[in-house]
């Protein structure tokens, strides 16, 4: 009897797998992870601990392999490909829209050369896209939530806005100079891939595949139960009213998020290929997804 109990305990411990999971405290990520965070879906033997940090902090920690599963910028993936694979769902794409370059004064897209431009981190896709658009500018790195204020005050010539700032910038009296997602679409006829979720390569293959399935189910649950998932996500929307939060989530949680598809995967590879060709990335990277 005692031996049987010990065996059952050991078996249960062997079956239970604890994984550290990190994502940003943004309404689109909150929407994606709603079902997982609130235990609306079954996770089998997987047990997740959730950590919320801004995307550039997550990029930097991914360089150290801190988390088992983490949200990352696709730009950052170029430096993480030896540690992480991309999960097949959870991607954020701007399909004809994306990070916005804004300025306080009468600045146009042709006059960004040499300007001091605030960007939300060296490993963000926003920075990579800005470098592809205009290679010759002076980057001023800062937290994404400070950029709009610094542009409005005139401390920098322009700024690249991500997250909700893309919808609220006009309130601060600044003007749109260029939409980098729109520009990218004209250049490539592809959506601009912004960020996805990476999983550590060193994990057991079955755990990797099971995690991919759980994340996909969490996103599907949110899309199928939009109202309750949106209510949860609005808690992370940094003061946005529900309708604006809804609009933001709609931009970045959609069919692309549930499944990259061939076109989405090609967009990620194209982004990193362009980065290498233009000298922004020091090496060419082959994107690898969990299958």
What kind of region is each of these model predictions?
Residues 19-20, 83-91, 116:
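A structural signal for short loop-to-beta-strand junctions that line the ligand-binding cleft
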Residues 28-32, 41-73:
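Extracytoplasmic small-molecule ligand-binding "clamshell" domains
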Residues 41-51, 133-146, 281-287:
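A local structural motif
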Residues 54-56, 65-78, 143-144, 161-167:
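Beta->alpha turn/N-cap motifs
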Residues 144-235:
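Pocket-lining segment of extracytoplasmic ligand-binding domains
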């Amino acid at each position: 009897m005692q031996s049987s109990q010990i065996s059952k305990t050991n078996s249960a411990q062997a079956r239970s797998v604890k994984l550290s999971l990190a994502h940003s405290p943004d309404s689109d990520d909150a929407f994606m992870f709603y079902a997982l965070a609130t235990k609306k879906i079954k996770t089998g033997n997987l047990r997740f601990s959730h950590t919320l940090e801004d995307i550039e902090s997550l990029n930097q920690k991914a360089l150290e392999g801190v988390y088992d599963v983490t949200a990352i910028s696709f730009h950052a993936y170029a430096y993480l490909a030896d540690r992480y694979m991309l999960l097949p769902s959870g991607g954020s794409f701007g399909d004809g829209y994306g990070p916005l370059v804004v300025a306080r004064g009468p600045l146009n897209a042709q006059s960004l050369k040499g300007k001091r431009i605030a960007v939300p981190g060296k490993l963000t896709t926003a920075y990579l896209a800005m470098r592809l658009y205009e290679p010759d500018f002076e980057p001023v790195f800062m937290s994404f939530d400070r950029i709009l204020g610094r542009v409005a005050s005139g401390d920098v010539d322009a700024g690249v806005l991500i997250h909700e700032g893309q919808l609220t910038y006009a309130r601060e009296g600044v003007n749109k100079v260029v939409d980098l997602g729109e520009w990218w679409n004209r250049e490539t006829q592809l959506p601009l891939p912004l960020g996805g979720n990476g999983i550590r390569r060193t994990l057991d293959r079955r755990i990797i595949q099971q995690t991919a399935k759980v994340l996909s189910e969490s996103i599907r649950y949110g899309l199928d139960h939009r109202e309750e998932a949106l209510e949860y996500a609005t808690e992370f929307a940094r003061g946005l009213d529900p309708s604006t939060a809804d609009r933001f989530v709609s931009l970045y949680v959609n069919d692309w998020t549930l499944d990259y598809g061939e076109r989405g995967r090609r967009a990620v590879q194209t982004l990193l290929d362009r980065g290498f060709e233009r000298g922004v990335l020091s090496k060419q990277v082959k994107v690898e997804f969990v299958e």
